Amino acid sequence: MKIAIFCPNWVGDLVMATAAMRAVRDRYPRAEIIGIMRPYLAEVLEGTGLIDRELYHDPRGTNPAHRGWALSRQLRLEKINLGLLFPNSFRTALIAWAGGIERRVGFARDARRWFLTDALKPKSRKTPHPVIDEYWRLAAHVGCRTAG
């Protein structure tokens, strides 16, 4: 099994996502887990064992291989079974869909429902809530044991 985890784009958010990523690793110990991330985040996960390797997404970067359509083509070649989309962006869902990921799990925000196979209902934006709770919900949806 191949799993793609689309990582949050900010260092602090990625750190908060590591517990949910650990739950995915524990639930799927034999899976190859690929982290999709901005290049500057690779060192944050280095040595953690949470991912087996990374692919970079840098839409404004100088390397054309890290842009959306090139990344989608690369994902298609990977034949990924499961994608967890931590970022709530339309772009992330579009890349996962165009990349041919079989099962795409994320929150139904910003018209991205059509690109997800498992579109979870988000909590209201009117009420503040910890983003880590959303990361746990994604992990729980794919069968992971979560805190709480």
PLM feature spans:
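Catalytic machinery of carbohydrate-active enzymes
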Residues: M1-G148
